[in-house]
Amino acid sequence: MDTRVTIITGPIGSGKSTALKYIKEKGFATTDLDSISNNILESQSSFEFLEANFSECLVQNKIDKKLLAEVVFTNQDKLNNLENYLHPLVTLQVATLIQQTTNHLFIEASAPKNIHQLYPTVVIFAEEPIRRKRLQSRGMSITDIDNRITTQPKESWWKSLGIVIENTSYTELHAQIEKLLDLSYE
């Protein structure tokens, strides 16, 4: 297990991005798998896959991420197809990034698949009512929130992945991250 890398994960709306932003502000290297995935999907090399499998999500030959989300979060087969396409490509880019990194790297993974087996993992967690409220404040519809939460694993699975940080407030999240960084990475 490569201890130069830590995975930051958790269910939607739990505060992964907030945690990663705070870690970055503390001077650590960070990246997130969603950005890597989006870059892959927007690349010309993905066009053939998208045209064959998600043509309804192409607008002027470019992927419409909102349409894609509507499709994959209401159709498990489509979600699996997209994940099976992206997973090896993302894994390759992450491996390259890790090779180029000399210091500790924190990687946000919203859908961790098997990456949590390769690196120490920190789960940012918040109870579902809190997550729903956060997602609504971002402008997500109740239907979209329901669709996304339904496709995600249950609480027990998330909490089995590694160290759990309960995110009840910004102050508490920052305090727990500080403690983690002090214990592990300095």
Give, region by region, the residue ranges found by the protein language model.
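Hydrophobic anchor at the beta1->P-loop junction of P-loop NTPases
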Residues: 8
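P-loop (Walker A) phosphate-binding loop of NTP-binding proteins
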Residues: 11, 23
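ATP-binding Walker
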Residues: 14
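Walker A/P-loop
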Residues: 17
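ATP-dependent small-molecule kinase phosphotransfer cores
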Residues: 35-102
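ATP-dependent NMP and nucleoside kinases share a basic, alpha-helical "lid"
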Residues: 93-99, 104-138
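Small-molecule kinase domains that catalyze NTP-dependent phosphoryl transfer to phosphate-bearing small molecules
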Residues: 94, 137-186
